[in-house]
Amino acid sequence: MVYQHLGLGDHFICNGLVNYISENPMQKNNTDIFTDIVMPCLSRNIEAVSYLYRDNKKISLLKVSDDKDHRPEVQAYSQNHNIPILMIGFYGWETTPEGWEETFYKQVGLEYFIRYSHFRLPKEPPPTMIKPPQEKYILIHNQCSSQTFELNIESDLKKIYFEETYPIFSYLELIRGATEIHCVNSAVFHLVESFQNLQAKLFFYPIRPDPCRVSTKWKTIGKHKTYL
């Protein structure tokens, strides 16, 4: 079992890690472990994470409660099925000089580039896909779970905003075809960051107090501690 932080953005950050482990099993006492991986997943994220790992047949999801501490559920499943738990990100990341995202990989002995080299989306498109307009456009995500932020974007291009009424993966074609993408720290930001060959210009707004690793492919609008 791979037990990571369960936010949707964390699933995007750790997708490369989980794919790598599923293809290169760890060993304990000369025996492969984590050859088939169970991953706890919050109920509200089941649809998105199921799609994310649809092509990886070694991954199965354990749905856990959204509204309470899920560790007892995870530990009970581990004990009942006699499977070990690989815990990622529950210790040590607060005081490291790297971004906490990179620490997740270091905790299991992996280089951070694996986040990108092993990030994969399914070959088949999701059930719902929003078609891009014919004209050039800017894609904007200015929301988090608690509020919406006003971003000062001066452009004559058409502006398209992420809306919570649509699944996150329904925006894949819009992400790939955008001229610019503007994000606050969110699951959308971590999804966009995981792509390697986007043509869009990327803009990050450090409005939220939560720090995150911002790579050099983003232009940061405002003050932010950047990890390179």
Question: Which residues fall in each region the model found?
Answer:
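Catalytic machinery of carbohydrate-active enzymes
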Residues: 1-228
